[in-house]
Structures are given as structure tokens and as C-alpha cells.
Swiss-Prot record:
Name assigned to this protein: Cyclotide vico-A
Gene Ontology biological-process annotations: defense response
Top-level taxon of the source organism: Eukaryota
Cross-link (Cyclopeptide (Gly-Asn)): 1-31
Function, as annotated: Probably participates in a plant defense mechanism.
Family recorded in the similarity comment: Belongs to the cyclotide family. Bracelet subfamily.
Pfam families: Cyclotide
Organism: Viola cotyledon
Amino acid sequence: GSIPCAESCVYIPCFTGIAGCSCKNKVCYYN
């Protein structure tokens, strides 16, 4: 929830989701 994963999720899900990242405010965050 606090560390950006250098990925946006405006149109598509987070590919980094497999690494523990989740979508928040159109940006992928880790924890």
C-alpha cells in the first residue's frame, strides 16, 4: 500500500500483482 510498483492500473490489472502489488488510486502499490 505505500511502495509504488512503477505500474499503472487505469485500463488493465497490475501485472506485478503476482509479486504482491495491488491497485490503488490507478497505480500499483506493494503493501
